[in-house]
Amino acid sequence: MCRDCGCSLGPAAQRAPFAAAPSVPGKTATIEVITAILGENDRVAAHNREHFDQHGVLALNLMSSPGAGKTSLLEATIRALDGRLKVAVIEGDLATENDADRIRACGVPAVQITTGNACHLDAQMVHDAVHDLPLAGLDVLFIENVGNLVCPASFDLGQHRNVTLLSVPEGDDKPAKYPAMFRAAD
């Protein structure tokens, strides 16, 4: 479902035939145009946002490169909040529950989304995970996206704000190399 990497351009992608104007009289060409790739994602994202709003939950999408420190930042934030706000976390990773286990060890509910080969979370994944969390009484839901500086920027998950984390060892040129990600940050 990516505009950036094309990871969903398989048989499920919606395509519409488009007849191009012939460049040579009497010859025609057919070009496939991909339509509304993110339309269903955006619909589910709007539903997620309504759900968060109805429960008074602020949803934050945390994005960065793999290993930049998203989970460490969440652990430090949870400790700093010291119970003043009720929080929960949705963790996105290609494999393992390692990060979700770290968050649970902080005493916070966490749901793991294991994406397999998908390089980002989408709204339906978040929707499904939300049903495993106690939204009633929550103040903040952190969504830790899959570590990737390309694809996550294109997907509305229903979050209220996007946070992009940049680690010093990555180099200071990441915003120039991955402008969509840093423009998506609030």
Model-predicted segments: where are they?
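Nucleotide-state-sensitive switch-loop elements of NTP-binding domains
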Residues: 16, 20-50, 54-57, 68, ...
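Hydrophobic anchor at the beta1->P-loop junction of P-loop NTPases
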Residues: 60-62
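Hydrophobic positions on the alpha1 helix immediately C-terminal to the Walker A/P-loop
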Residues: 73
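Long, basic/Gly/Ser/Thr-rich N-terminal segments
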Residues: 1-23
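Short glycine-rich anion-binding loops that position phosphate/pyrophosphate groups of nucleotides
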Residues: 10, 64-65, 146-148, 168-171
